[in-house]
Amino acid sequence: MSSTKSDFEIIREYIIGDGKDISVGKAPEGNVRLEITHSVLTGESLGTNNFKNFSLDLKIKDFKEKLYRFVGTEPKYMELILRDENKVNDICKIDDDDDKTLGSYEPKDGMNVHIIDKDPNNFVSELQDISKAPKPVISEEDYNKREGTYKKWKEENQLKKENDTTATTVTATTTTTNNATDTEIEIKVGDRCKVISDDPTNYDERLGKVQYVGTVEFSSGVWIGVELDLPLGKNDGSVKGKQYFQCSPKYGCFAKPKNVLVGDYPEEEI
């Protein structure tokens, strides 16, 4: 019996992707998209997105500095191995000639750079095991009396979101494309923004620019079309053959207004 996808699954695939490896996306011209792994740090420690874009003209000494900011291993203690996308075959060792460029090693999108930490004083692996660390114990009643806690912040933030939604005064038909019904929002085309997840445990966020605000054919209500800074999207501004805005493949995504935060965000780079 053939299985069919629900409307929710279809919409989810168009908005946030269909679960494929994000290394499939191509880096912008003149860049390469590489997966970063570490001999000590686990994948959980590095985060869910350890694929990063790098300029092919980047000198190795500058490449190491960027890796240092990502993993915390000092450049002088790094040994870098370029591996295939399956992380099985070593292609070459990235030597210590800091004036060479990353492009001179001919890396391809999806390949892996594995960092071997040679620091003799490294104790990061011990820090990753928190099972034996002492944990403070406090009753829920005492915790609720405290100010400045995460719980208080979350409650205040949620209340602020609800108030902002209620108090919005800009009509969509005056600030959006294609008649976004009478829903009132404050997001307009050209705004810099951050796309966030509904999942409170998912801290991934994507930066970009609003390119479309309005109704869509694939779902009800108002949707925000965003051109992302990095190829972490699903589409090119079109869904099911309908073009809502123009952008490169994998740079487009759609989100509900509540998942789009407008602000003076700088263009995203590693």
Curated annotation (Swiss-Prot):
The cross-references to InterPro entries, in alphabetical order and at most eight, read: CAP-Gly_dom_sf, CAP-Gly_domain, TBCB_Ubl, Ubiquitin-like_dom, Ubiquitin-like_domsf
What highest taxon heads this organism's lineage? Eukaryota
- GO CC annotations, alphabetized: cytoplasm; microtubule plus-end; nucleus
Q: Identify the residues that the record assigns to the CAP-Gly domain, covering every copy.
A: 214-256
Q: Which Pfam families match?
A: CAP_GLY, Ubiquitin_2
Please state the protein's primary subcellular location: cytoplasm
List, alphabetically, the CDD domains matched: Ubl_TBCB
Record keywords, A-Z: Chaperone, Cytoplasm, Cytoskeleton, Microtubule
Localization per record? Cytoplasm; Cytoplasm, Cytoskeleton
BP GO annotations: cytoplasmic microtubule organization; post-chaperonin tubulin folding pathway; tubulin complex assembly
MF term (GO), any: microtubule plus-end binding
UniProt cross-references to PROSITE patterns, sorted A to Z: CAP_GLY_1, CAP_GLY_2
According to its UniProt entry, the function of this protein is described as: Binds to alpha-tubulin folding intermediates after their interaction with cytosolic chaperonin in the pathway leading from newly synthesized tubulin to properly folded heterodimer.
Quaternary context: Supercomplex made of cofactors A to E. Cofactors A and D function by capturing and stabilizing tubulin in a quasi-native conformation. Cofactor E binds to the cofactor D-tubulin complex; interaction with cofactor C then causes the release of tubulin polypeptides that are committed to the native state.
The record's comment on protein family reads: Belongs to the TBCB family.
UniProt-recorded name of the protein: Tubulin-specific chaperone B
Q: Which organism is it from?
A: Dictyostelium discoideum (Social amoeba)
What lineage is this protein's organism placed in? Eukaryota, Amoebozoa, Evosea, Eumycetozoa, Dictyostelia
